[in-house]
Swiss-Prot record:
One of its GO terms (cellular component) is BORC complex. Residues 11-33 have a biased composition (Basic and acidic residues). Pfam families: BLOC1_2. Belongs to the BLOC1S2 family. GO terms for biological process: anterograde axonal transport; anterograde synaptic vesicle transport; endosomal transport; lysosome localization; neuron projection development. The modification N-acetylalanine is found at A2. It comes from the Eukaryota. This is Biogenesis of lysosome-related organelles complex 1 subunit 2. Its main location: cytoplasm. InterPro entries: BLOC1_su2. One of its GO terms (molecular function) is gamma-tubulin binding.
Amino acid sequence: MAAAAEGVLATRRDESARDDAAVETAEEAKEPAEADITELCRDMFSKMATYLTGELTATSEDYKLLENMNKLTSLKYLEMKDIAINISRNLKDLNQKYAGLQPYLDQINVIEEQVAALEQAAYKLDAYSKKLEAKYKKLEKR
């Protein structure tokens, strides 16, 4: 059992030695030199200015695009307004022409009614003449 205990102790010592080798030693954080900080700040401000300029340019371009779209939409609505005015004018002209034709259309309706009445009278006359003819033939046979 003593040999087993010594083996366990030896294994633990080996593991402890490996753990120490795996641990890195921390170095003290040192501040960069003043010149490095100044250069880094300049670089940061330069890159930030470039970034902000890009963002502002993109926003400005978006607004210009929106302005152009609004102008085109306005022009399209003006065209549609002109078309609507022309349609309205043409409709008024057609209504005036229809009003001018209305007496003639009324006359046509009256004539159509008279023709229908005349046609009915012709059918009645035809029927009456057929009756007379039938009576005449009947009297002739006697």
